[in-house]
Every structure is written in structure tokens, then in C-alpha cells.
Amino acid sequence: MKRTFQPSNLVRKRRHGFRARMATPSGRAILRRRRAKGRHKLSA
């Protein structure tokens, strides 16, 4: 059986990267929450 996690840095950046987050209002909300929480790493 094929495993569910097949790592790809390109897909990782496109789906969870900073620019992907900034592209949508809900994504910007995620960044806002993570900044408020004090996360050093905001996105993948």
C-alpha cells in the first residue's frame, strides 16, 4: 500500500507557503493569529 505522505518541497511551498497564505483572506487570518501567538515560523 502506498503511504499517504509523499514529500515534495514544491507542493509544500505552494500549498502552505507564505505567498499561498497571503493570497486569501482566511490565509491572512492564519498569519495574523500566528503573529499574535508569537510564532517564529509563520508558514512552511
From Swiss-Prot:
Classification via Gene3D superfamilies: 1.10.287.3980
Listed A to Z, the keywords are:
Ribonucleoprotein, Ribosomal protein
| Keyword Cell wall biogenesis/degradation on entry | no
User: Which Pfam family, any one of them, does this sequence belong to?
Assistant: Ribosomal_L34
Q: Where is the composition biased (Basic residues)?
A: 30-44
Q: What InterPro entries does its record include?
A: Ribosomal_bL34 (IPR000271), Ribosomal_bL34_CS (IPR020939)
Per the record, the domain of life is: Bacteria
Cellular component annotations (GO), alphabetically ordered: ribonucleoprotein complex; ribosome
GO biological process terms held by the UniProt record: translation
Gene Ontology terms for molecular function: structural constituent of ribosome
Q: Where is this region: Disordered?
A: 1-44
The record's comment on protein family reads: Belongs to the bacterial ribosomal protein bL34 family.
Query: What's the protein called, per UniProt?
Result: Large ribosomal subunit protein bL34
**Which species expresses this protein natively?**
Rickettsia canadensis (strain McKiel)
